Amino acid sequence: MTQRKTAFLVAAAMTATMGLAACSGGSASNGASDGSGVKVTWNMWAGSTDDEKWVADTADIVRSQNPDIELDTQTSSWGDYFTKLTANASSGNLACVTSMNGQRLSGFHQTLSPLSDEDLKKAGIDKSAFADGALDILSYDGKVYGVPYDVAAMMVYYNRDMLAETGTPEPAADWTFDDFVATAKGATTDAHKGFAVGMGEFQWMALPIAKSGVQPVDPSSTLQLTDPAFVEAAEWYADLVLKEKVADPVPSASEAGWGEDQYSNGNVAMAVDGTWNAVGYFTNDAGFKAGATRLPSGDKGSLGLVLGSGFGIAANCEGAERDAALKVLGSLVSKEAQDLIGSSGRSFPALKASQPAYFESLDESIRDDIKAAFEAAFSDTVGQNSTAKWTQVNEYFTPNLVSVYSGAMPMSEMLSQAQAQFGN
């Protein structure tokens, strides 16, 4: 997913860089077998002053719940976080508590320690207390590698003013792909298009996945970009630009947030993006009235994916340090910490009991609309299948999507080339 201002929660730090090893400052010989008297470091990505306040407040919750554990925090910007994580992983030098984005887990799962039911029990974590599919976010090959702090789903956002101006009905929660095309056509005029295509992984793939009922990766973590149903749906998506003329081509690969930016600036009637940007869109600076609803459905229903980020335990974290890290993990996703996330309106908590706090934090003028959109968007979501080469696949897509949208490269060719390059 494109990481924008509120893309999944970001955190703060006592230091400006990720620094050295996280599990330093304490060892099995220095702490009790239950993890008390040990120093633990929590590593997170950070992007703003607000993010820093969130991590500081969250760290205070952890410390208050675990006064016998010394907690340090380290952060880096989103852009640098995974680069530095790769470097630290190669030396076996990860923070005991390492934050992880679900879409990137496949490339880092070997650096994290699988969490057993006994581990979760030690951490005080009840799996049944989390939203449906939430534990799938940080699971890989049947093993749980982390616990999520938020959940997200993709939605179609629309400009209510633009639809009213063109006499186009607003989407209903049970709309179909035929309805989607009709809405895009109805809202397309000489002055603006009815839709803006995406460049980010799920900003563009969400509709083909929903239409085909097929994920680009199968349950065995095998890339299946040339699955006939997925290819057909992806070609339909490209044709929104090439044949239906309801969307403009993307000018260049540097326009990584093309669809989202076109929508938020009031230039188009619809775009696809995640629930994490709902508040920003509903309070947009362009001044239009926003709406949102679930992805449309087709002959195979409407397959949506539950996405998010969370926290894991590094594989190099052992003994008393690991026991202490499990306690920290439990506190990071405790109701108190999840209520903090929800009440700030920053992200939608993974813990079911804390989700009402998110809606209560919203202004009354947008609360009911966002709540209805979320309820629809999360109604049929499943966990994302992923592969170790998923990041490389999406890096390949970015420049080539520009060629697809311009008509210089067929969508089927882009998918087949990616399958040939990354499918083995």
Where do the model's predicted regions map?
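Glycine-centered hinge/linker elements that transmit conformational signals in sensory
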Residues: 184, 222-251
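Short, low-complexity disordered leader/linker segments with a strong preference
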Residues: 1-40, 64, 416, 420-424
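Extracytoplasmic "Venus flytrap"/periplasmic binding protein-like
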Residues: 61-129, 165-167, 262, 269-270, ...
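A structural signal for short loop-to-beta-strand junctions that line the ligand-binding cleft
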Residues: 95-96, 123-162, 193-194, 291, ...
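Short, solvent-exposed loop/beta-turn-alpha elements that line the ligand-binding surface or hinge
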Residues: 116-130, 173, 194-195, 214-233, ...
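Extracytoplasmic/periplasmic substrate-recognition and gating elements
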Residues: 64, 166, 242-244, 283-347, ...
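C-terminal capping/gating helix-and-loop segments adjacent to ligand/active sites or protein-protein/ligand interfaces
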Residues: 368-419
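Periplasmic solute-binding protein
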Residues: 107-116, 134-170, 198-220, 306-314, ...
